[in-house]
Structures are given as C-alpha cells and as structure tokens.
Amino acid sequence: MTHEFTESYDVIVIGAGHAGVEASLATSRMGCKTLLATINLDMLAFMPCNPSIGGSAKGIVVREIDALGGEMSKNIDKTYIQMKMLNTGKGPAVRALRAQADKSLYAREMKHTVEKQANLTLRQTMIDDILVEDGRVVGVLTATGQKFAAKAVVVTTGTALRGEIILGELKYSSGPNNSLASVTLADNLKKLGLEIGRFKTGTPPRVKASSINYDQTEIQPGDDKPNHFSFMSKDADYLKDQIPCWLTYTNQTSHDIINQNLYRAPMFSGIVKGVGPRYCPSIEDKIVRFADKERHQLFLEPEGRDTEEVYVQGLSTSLPEDVQKDLIHSIKGLEKAEMMRTGYAIEYDIVLPHQLRATLETKLISGLFTAGQTNGTSGYEEAAGQGLIAGINAALKVQGKPELILKRSDAYIGVMIDDLVTKGTLEPYRLLTSRAEYRLILRHDNADMRLTEIGRDIGLVDDERWKAFEIKKNQFDNELKRLNSIKLKPVKATNDRVQELGFKPLTDAMTAKEFMRRPEIDYATAVSFVGPAAEDLDAKIIELLETEIKYEGYIRKALDQVAKMKRMEEKRIPANIDWDAIDSIATEARQKFKKINPETIGQASRISGVNPADISILMIYLEGNGKAHRKY
C-alpha cells in the first residue's frame, strides 16, 4: 500500500508522559528528527498519582538515567520541595534518594525543556494507528486522518491505552486524571498481532491542607545534608526551605467503614477486571489481606508549594465518594479534612512484554518500540528508564548503529528490562532491590562510574558533564592507588595513636586501604595517619572510596559472578532456531523457549520453569551446530 505522508520524521514518540519525554529527548539529542505526539500538551510529564520521584531502587534508576544523559534527574533537582535519603541505617546497596516534587512545576519545567530542544517537534494530536509495511514501521495515522512517516515509532501511552476510570459503581472511558483515553490505537495494536493484557492501578484522595489538623500527626522532615539526583547538581543549590510531610494512621473505625462497604467496592464487586499492583495495593485490599493489622501508615504529602492539595499516600481506593469521605474523617488529623479530589482506579491495556527484545523493540514489527506502563510496569522512574533505552535504541536503529542492551550487572534499568522480556509480568511490575542479584555493584553512589562512558559513546553526555566525570574518576582512582601504596607499620608511635582512638593496635604492617577495611576506620581517620590527598576531595568521592574499600571482598565476589554470567550472555542463540528439533528438553522449557525466544544462553537460563538440565541440552545442541539431539 502506498501512503501519502504530510510530514516525515526519523522517530515518532506516542505519549508525553515520563517514558515519552525521555525517549523523545534522547532521539532528538542523538540527531534524529523527532515528533512527540500527545493527547494533551498540558499533561506533559504530569504526575497523575504520587507527587514524588525516587524511593527504594527507583532512586537508583533516576541516578542511572542521569549518568546516561537523561532528564528526569535534572528536572526533579530543580523542582523538589523535600529531599530524603532512605535506608541510611542499612548497607550501601539499598540506600536511595526520594524527593517530594512540586508536581505542577515539575511538569512546566519539563515542558520548557522539551519545547526548546533542537530536532524535536511537540504536537497535541491523537495517534490512532501504526502504519506497517512488510513487517516494519513506516509511520502513524492521526485521528484527523493525517499520515506522518517515520523510520521508528516508540509507543509510550501509559494508562491511556483503552483506559477506564472506576469510582464506586461508576465506570467510564478515560485516561489518567480524566484525560482522553486512546481506544482506537489499542484496537489497532491488537490487530497488528501484538498480545494485549489488562492491568489496573489506582490513586488516593487529595485533601485540603488548611483543613488538616497537623497537631494530630507526626512531622516527616527532609534531610539537612545536601543530596541530589543529578551528578551535575551543586551542594550550594540544595533547597534549605523544604516542606515537610506528615504521618498518620488508619484505625479500627477506618477498617470498619471499609469492611461494611466492601460490597460497594469495585475491587470485590467484579467491576474491576484488570490485575492490580502487588506492592501498592488499595486500602480496601490491604484491610482484607492483612486483617490482623490494627493500623496502616498514611503519609500526607504536599503536591506543591503553591497548592492546597495534599496526597494521602497509602489510601489508594476506588470506593464510592461518600465512603471515601467517611473514611478520611475517621483518620486522626483528618477529622475535618476537605476532600478536594476523590481516589479512583484505572484499568488499561498493556503490551505483554515477553514480545519485546532487550532493546524494547517488538519482535513482531521492526522499528516499533514500547516503553513505560505500556509494557506493564508501574512508577514514573521505571517508565523514564525504559523510555530512555527505547529512545536510544530507536535512534541507533535509524542511524544503522549497534544497539544498546544494558545487562543485569550494568544497571537496575537492565534488571528491569531483562525481567520484563525474559519472565514477563502478571501484574504491574515494580522495581525492588531484591530483584537485583548484583545490587552491591548497582549502588546509588556509583551510577556515574557505571554508565557515564556508555552515555558518552552514544552521544547523550555533553563535554561539560564528561569533563566533570573524568576529573572525579581520576581523583577517585588516584586516591585509591595512593591508599593502597602507603604502609602503616606496627611501631609504638602508630599503635599509641590507634589505642588513643579506642581501636585495636596493629600487629602487622598494612596499607592505608587495608586499615580502612576495619569497620571503625573511616576515611578521615585513615588520612590522619597517612596524610591527605594531593587535592581536596569532594564528600561524594570520599563516600565512594569508603564503600568500595570496606565492601571490596563482597564486590569482588559479585564481579566474579558477573564474569561467569557474561560468558553465558555471549553465547548467542540463532533467531531462527527450531525448538522442536532439540530432543530431550522438558515440555515446559520448550513451551517457554517458543514463547520468549531467548537471544542468549544467559537469558534462556533465567526463564522461569527452565532447569539447568534444559540449558545443558541446549548448549550441547548449539555447540554441535544444531546436529546433536536433533529429531530425525
């Protein structure tokens, strides 16, 4: 079929949420003429649910986005109202930043960034169809009948894809926050042959700040110590006038109200059909599943500096409006609270992610990429990370360059994408530190060391950032080398000082680096014995040195595991392999291999239901050039 195109682009991104913004900025910055199409320009980078960025594992993803040259990190550093480092009492592997955002300012700042970006056209329009010829993308069709040509298309439609809002017995077609739903595109994605799933998520009510009795709640302030998501942000710019959050709880009265109205809850009446998020359940779901709990935490989170709206985190619900009011008034501090917006549930279509390659390109259609909640994830950060990778790979494909695949040992983004394309997901996927087997090397403090060179190679890290990174890396490397070269000897003068500080004396000579491995010895103590570095070191470099030195043994073990897995990842599986020709593998393994079509032995080994014996047979088959274990 010959199409008459009115406009032509290298890449078209459908949807301007957190995934779409990162995808379009990446493609345009890599030199591709890009169109970012959105149903509503006023909702670009909008936060329809929680007004925050970061959190456990998620905060590390934002740092990874920054190291690769993405935008979310810089934007939240410009627009937060509170910053907090989580899990400071635990090990470095699980520490992560979380920021409360001024949600309106966040969206405005990101829109301004997109508007001034070269090579990027921003357009309010509804995309109804993906145009495909001979198994590859050639463009898109708008609701008004316009056809735009494209060499690659990235679908980042979020919860708008056949979205339906549910509130009590009310159910109607809608995207998030009462925006338009994308129904025709959902129909046409299915017609293209993609397998579609149905998920559900929800949001809590918002209450008016001036109607809250804060004296009945517990204050939750931000941190005084400067922290940032972007490695380029300066401590001098750290916000001093932060806005606190507040903590309160549900109680038995709250639980009674919910239990008495379960028959009216869409979650239990059968109105909700989609699968909801395990790690962010509705309050009615929590009350039923954890009936033994006397109370549940609720955080009152301001939505911005210039608004009265307060987000009641932990109270996600689709109960009828009258029940929501009663529920709110049962909570300490909210007895007279004015509900400004009701909570609601939203159901939406997803593209089942086992149909994707690790580049986030669909296996079915060349040049068609998907990212974000479209792939079955939850969260702004997960969406932004996928959007960045999808955008990068769309640009690389258009330019005929090698693709970028982040491994599980490279980044949490790599863990997430590998989980999605290898295991799929039966519920909205959320990143957790427990999902990463190499979390000690995927830390908050070393994201730039892991990924900045990759960002530079693909063209997203500019000269200023690259110079700053080189300076930091050289300072780190030089100081590590110095600490490993200076010896402390167990002489009287040294041991007298050691014992004065309350530490065990030295029995053997050791390097300053070995001295620092002692749990009680920090960098400042070590250099008091061996002298300072040639130049003043930033506190973040010192933190990195302490972590790398104190956990060196564990880090080395993790790197050994990475090297072992790398050998399996390098063993490619032919795309046209005949799984039925391999004798002796288990039926379940054969079915999973056919469904997912893994690209490497490493990926095959991570598929649920596949055991080591199946992998051994597969490797023997491949090593025999397809002759061993072939059926005749």
From Swiss-Prot:
Cellular compartments annotated: Cytoplasm
Domain of life: Bacteria
UniProt cross-references to Pfam families, sorted A to Z: GIDA, GIDA_C_1st, SAM_GIDA_C
Main location: cytoplasm
Keywords, alphabetical: Cytoplasm, FAD, Flavoprotein, NAD, tRNA processing
GO cellular component: cytosol
Cofactor: FAD
Family annotation (InterPro entries): FAD/NAD-bd_sf (IPR036188), GIDA_C_N (IPR049312), MnmG (IPR004416), MnmG-rel (IPR002218), MnmG-rel_CS (IPR020595), MnmG_C (IPR026904), MnmG_C_subdom (IPR047001), MnmG_C_subdom_sf (IPR044920)
GO MF annotation, one: flavin adenine dinucleotide binding
Function recorded in the entry: NAD-binding protein involved in the addition of a carboxymethylaminomethyl (cmnm) group at the wobble position (U34) of certain tRNAs, forming tRNA-cmnm(5)s(2)U34.
Quaternary structure and partners: Homodimer. Heterotetramer of two MnmE and two MnmG subunits.
Similarity field: Belongs to the MnmG family.
Name of the protein this chain belongs to: tRNA uridine 5-carboxymethylaminomethyl modification enzyme MnmG
Species of origin: Streptococcus pyogenes serotype M18 (strain MGAS8232)
